[in-house]
Amino acid sequence: MSTAIKAPTGKVYQTKQSPCEALKGALPCRFIFSGRSGCGKTNVAVNLLTRDRLFGKCFDRIYIFSPNAFADHAWEPVRAYIKHALKVDEKKDPCFFEAWDEAVMQQLIDEHGRIVRRQKRRGDTMLASAAFVIDDWIDDPKICHGANNPISGLAIKGRHKNCSLFLLSQKLYAIAPTIRVNSTGVLLWGCT
């Protein structure tokens, strides 16, 4: 018996990737953006999600969870992108959520997982991709540090459902260690 480690065989699945050399192969990702209020976290996230040379055209669905989802005008380019580029009717398929609701988030994650499983059963190799953006909720310990919260689930297992996580927080260490350890990228601005 050979002791050599062999790569698994089987179907190789892909997800759309950024044309930017520095971001190729990054998706699905688990990115943390951390810095004080007004430092540019939201603007960087908006640009990553909507610019074609970054992650624009990579996601089939984008979901924004923020207590300021409708009040913060910085999210308007994402709203326009979802409507015009992704052709999503927000009245039928909401993408912006102001109130924290774990059940709604988990339902969206599970639904995307079902879509990916159907694609795999059909034999598709290019899989649908979803981005979940959590802005200004992670500082609440009830949300971030719960045993079975959907944010931790995305950080640990989201890649299996082709889900990316973009987590925006003013306090890096308010983010649960499980989430920090599983991040694939961290952007920091004068953190606390």
Q: What does each model-found stretch correspond to?
A:
Residues 78-82, 184:
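Short secondary-structure boundary/capping segments
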Residues 50-60:
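Post-Walker A helix-loop "phosphate-sensing" segment adjacent to the P-loop in P-loop NTPases
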Residues 81-98:
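Nucleotide-state-sensitive switch-loop elements of NTP-binding domains
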Residues 17-19, 29-52, 67-69, 99-192:
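Conserved P-loop NTPase motor cores
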Residues 61-77:
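Conserved Walker A/P-loop ATP-binding site and its immediately adjacent core
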Residues 26:
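Residues immediately N-terminal to the Walker A/P-loop in ABC ATPase nucleotide-binding domains
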Residues 1-20, 69:
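N-terminal pre-Walker A segment at the start of P-loop NTPase domains
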